[in-house]
Regions:
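Adenosyl-5′-phosphate
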Residues: 2-232
Length: 232
């Protein structure tokens, strides 16, 4: 948190959204690839959106970034894919354009009063029991940390750690092996990073090497869910 406060608003917000910082990414890449991308800064996408917002305050600019990146390219995409996979047309009523316009007109001080979703919590007072109205936000996170010790363990070892793994041309194998061992032993949790490596390997096989044997990017998750259900 202090590290994010030491930089400009856009950079700080971008760092707070990231699951890996630039130093960790560079450590994970092979020296050759790290040199190639040395001048690339992924946070430029955050800065561009932040600067596009004409609101004068930091909070509104951060919310604009969240709508453009975290919402549009993240949560909504995943929910839509998951819904359509089961024949469901998912709707997001609180993203109705009139509701969004109203939300943007709410003064910043009121948006932040009372903690997260303060205004919404006040609206439902008396309509929901107190424990529901005041509880912490709960999302639908994928249990990657557990999966890589269970149903995704073999896949990672066979595809990412294999001597002939395509992803080896991108990454430092020693660093990858270290974080894998840290994860398995419980010293640290690296679920999101390990998943990125699985996806990088699949992407490389599909788009750079034209491998017809490559499964779709969602196959690992589907297989993990299937195996997890079998275990349960």
């Amino acid at each position: 948190t202090l590290r994010n406060l030491a930089v400009d608003g856009a950079t700080g917000h971008g760092q707070s959204m990231s699951t890996m910082d630039a130093e960790d990414v560079c450590d994970l890449l092979s020296p050759e690839v790290a040199r190639e991308v040395d001048e690339y800064d992924a946070l430029d996408h955050v800065r561009n959106l932040y600067d596009r917002c004409d609101a004068p305050d930091h909070v509104s600019k951060c919310q604009f970034v969240d709508m453009g990146l975290g919402l549009a390219d993240g949560i909504l995409t995943k929910v839509d894919r998951a819904g359509m996979a089961h024949g469901l047309e998912v709707r997001s009523p609180m993203l109705d354009y009139e509701w969004v316009q109203l939300a943007w007109r709410v003064p910043v001080a009121m948006r932040m009063t009372g903690g997260g979703k303060g205004g919404l919590r006040r609206i439902v007072e008396g309509k929901l029991n107190k424990s529901t109205a005041t509880r912490r936000k709960t999302g639908f996170e994928v249990p990657l940390n557990e999966w890589f010790k269970g149903p995704l363990r073999d896949r990672f070892q066979e595809e990412v750690l294999a001597p002939n793994a395509i992803v080896r041309e991108w990454i430092d194998h020693d660093v990858t092996r270290r974080i894998w061992n840290e994860h398995l032993t419980g010293r640290k949790t690296h679920g999101p990073t390990l998943w990125k490596l699985v996806m990088l390997n699949s992407w490389s096989r599909m788009y750079l090497h034209g491998s017809e044997a490559c499964a779709s990017p969602d196959t690992a998750a589907h297989q993990a869910v299937h195996n997890a259900k079998g275990i349960a």
